[in-house]
Amino acid sequence: GMNPNAKIPEGMTYEDNTFLDMLKEDLNINVVYDWVASSSDYDEKMNLCIGSNTIPELMNVNAEQYRALLKYDLIQPIGSYYEDYASDKLKSYVESGGEALQKVICNEDGEMMAIPAPNITAGGVNEMWIRQDWLDNLGLEAPRTWDEMVAVAEAFVKEDPDGNGENDTIGILGPANSDYVNGNGGNRYGLDPLFSAFQSYPKYWMKDDSGNVVYGSITEETKVALEKVAGLYADGLIDPEILVRNDSSEPLLAGKVGIFFGPWWCGYTVGDATLAQEADWQAYFTPLAEDGKFYTHMAEPTTKYVVASKECKNPEAAFKIINYLIEYEQGWVDSGATSGLSTSDLYPLYNVYDNANEIEVSYDCLKKYLAGEIGIDDVDYSTHKLLKSDMEAITKLKKEPYDDFSLEYWNFEDEDLAKTNLPRLVSIMVGDAPLVNEEYVPIYNSYDGRTKTMDSKWSNLTKLEEETFAKIITGKAGIEAFDSFVEEWKASGGDEITKEIQDEVDMQQ
């Protein structure tokens, strides 16, 4: 899959470039492309190859393609090659994904079928981000339950938390017209936690206790959640321009918003407000469900799979190529050896490799480092690419007390240093704090492939769902519209798709 806008230096091509020379010279691996396609045509071309069983020996595929390759029995197990050839670093990345990752890269016999590039676990968890300074102005505690959140949102709308005498504040921000109420994994400005509080997981395929697959958007729990969210909108507590405005960042950065939802990296989203010292944003697992637990849907453990066809005689080459990338990529960047070359465009089987728990590890190390429990030389940085620079920056940017990450305890004197590092440090130390310090119940998608009927009917079903949810939330339709939506969804291909997914999931048991 080639980026059509890739900048390829003069005299080089995809088939003839520095990276391929290195692999030939250092590993005696001769990389030959079966075909080259731009990113936009790549999936189509790969799907054709899968359909006609003319796949390359080694390839980088997405989740849907991987499921299809497994289903049609076109790829070989690579577990023994993994044991013998994967470097310690590659193994540590794969192991960091734990059981959730193992489940998706193994076939029903438990054999490893793919080399994954793990997704960062924290990226799939949406939390409540809230203006701590507004809470302080109004003498309120950070809300944790649904009812507390409602009371705080009401105060944010009605009690002039910014003290400007104007009635111009938004309690809970929502998605703009190009965003989503519910997403898969991380969903900035979405309302996912408002649904999970009722154990509703729209857009996810759930397995019930007896192993039956159910689509999360059509459950009774989702009906309950929609009615509750519609109530917030009717009471003026959710952005009145939800799903209409062009950009939800606008009111946010204008200082008009008290609460929004999103993943750990939203420290970057509020970065400008932090750097201007205008807003103290903190993150919480809110709202808790009635049983006091925080339920959250998770991102897929990986969306990038490197696989070997049944015909491939040397699957170990894939491990050697990936080991080499992991070992030397940072060095190439630091030394300028590959300047002008885009590794992601030209390196074969390229993926970004990270630890699934990278952000939690970073939080833990930075916290211990600030507390004087570890020194800068006590950490193995070999698989933690950014941690050393984080540690160096945090000592200069953090004021005492070292365990309080409120706005006033950051140091803003060195503007350049703050600009470069603070949004990231806030993302880790504020955004990831709930994930490290509190329990949560992770809910995974049971199916991330694509069935036959999905090809023809899924986009219409998705449109029906999103339009219905939007109408119910904004009061253009009553909650009874949910029941007719479910009927229509089932009759228009939903039941058919559910059965196809059930068959696939049963096969994998």
Give names to the regions the model predicted.
Residues 227-230, 279-288, 294-375:
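Polar, glycine-rich mid-to-C-terminal structural blocks
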Residues 1-149, 193, 213-215, 333-335, ...:
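Conserved N-terminal structural module of periplasmic/extracytoplasmic solute-binding proteins
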Residues 330-467, 476:
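Conserved small-residue motifs centered on glycine
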Residues 63-100, 104, 153-156, 165-205, ...:
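Carboxylate/His-rich catalytic cores and anion/metal-binding grooves
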Residues 79, 107-186, 207-256, 306-341, ...:
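Helix-loop-helix "hinge/cap" segment bordering the ligand-binding cleft or interdomain interface
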Residues 30-36, 240-241, 282-284:
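General small-molecule cofactor/ligand-binding pocket signal
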Residues 77-97, 141, 202-220, 289-296, ...:
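Short, solvent-exposed loop/beta-turn-alpha elements that line the ligand-binding surface or hinge
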Residues 2-18, 122-129, 136-142, 177-235, ...:
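Extracytoplasmic/periplasmic substrate-binding proteins
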